[in-house]
Amino acid sequence: MNHPVFKPSFARTDARGVFHEIRNGDEIWKSVNLGEMRQGAVLGNHYHTTSRLFFFMLSGKVRIDFLHAKTGERDTIELNPLEGVYLEPYESHAILFLDSGRFMLLKSEAFNPKKPDIYPLKADEGGSR
């Protein structure tokens, strides 16, 4: 399993401030979320069967442990501010906040409480913690 880390593809700075283009592609996101977590918080330890996600750090640092639900393959990456990664279907993910931080989460599907597409699976068991 390989998880490339994405950085902004474009940045413009002028007298008004800074503008970063995070992704420029043909993805269509149905859910856009902003979050803020404390140091030591863990998100995830689950996977999705149909949803594709893009997780992007705005501030702070995280470690993400991946475990593929079908193959058992593992991967671990760290993200710093202005870095992001795709979370593909069947990839269980445990996102550990190494610092307090803010993030953006884009989802290919809106959350449906009647059919949540969330399946518990600890990705950080036996990992590098």
Question: Where do the language-model regions lie?
Answer:
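Tight coil/turn sites that cap or link beta-strands
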Residues: M37-G40, L82, E88-Y90, S100
